[in-house]
Amino acid sequence: MKTAEPEQVLTLLKAQDVRRANWQSGIDAAYWACHEKYQENIYVPFISPPVRGWVFVVGVPPLEAAHLPTTQRFEALTAPLVAHFPEVQAFGSYRVVDYVAWAKAVDGQWLRRFAYADGEILQNEGAQTAEERQLGLIDLHGSEFAEGEFEAWVDCDGSDEYMPLKLAGLWSVNPDDLPEMDIAPGIGWVERIF
């Protein structure tokens, strides 16, 4: 979220069982919940301290139109954030199934939402952004690959697990770059979401 106030994020997410956490323990909790509690629909996101005007929420349901309950959960969690903050972005990857996803909302509206896994376009809404083109991603149209597009998608590394991070760096902040950034130490929060 484009904000320097993580407390607003906590309020909008209707946080339960909130605890302070440093980056390491917060990321560990989010990662554990994503892998161990996913089937129980329990999420334990980490809400970061501000980084260059952005607050990260790590460990929320993925953007995946092909799985309706997950998509509804994503919508329910992000709707108040999109309505409140000037810009909201979402990114995801899971290398086991070549899952990649990204989404960008500005001024209360999703401008771009894209998700792909296992050779299938799960979601493709909004126009491709200049930053996606800058990364060499082909402009896919619709929800299915046209003739030759799948091969072109593979050739441009569209499903590379680092693609969402690269795009995050062009849209805002690449989380992979955090260790090299000159940012003040900070404490965030972990919370429980059902």
Segments from the language model and where they lie:
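Short, extreme N-terminal segment that most often corresponds to the first beta-strand
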Residues: M1-N22, G188-F194
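Intrinsic-disorder-associated interaction segments
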Residues: K2, H67-T70, F74, C156-D160, ...
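Alpha-helix capping and helix-coil boundary motifs
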Residues: T3-Q8, A66, A146-E149, D160
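Long, compositionally biased intrinsically disordered terminal regions
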Residues: D107, L111-F194
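Intrinsic-disorder/low-complexity coil detector
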Residues: E5, V44, S48-P49, V60-P61, ...
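Short, intrinsically disordered low-complexity segments
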Residues: V18-A115
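Generic detector of well-ordered alpha-helical segments enriched in charged/polar residues
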Residues: E7-L10, E75-V82, E151, P164-A168, ...
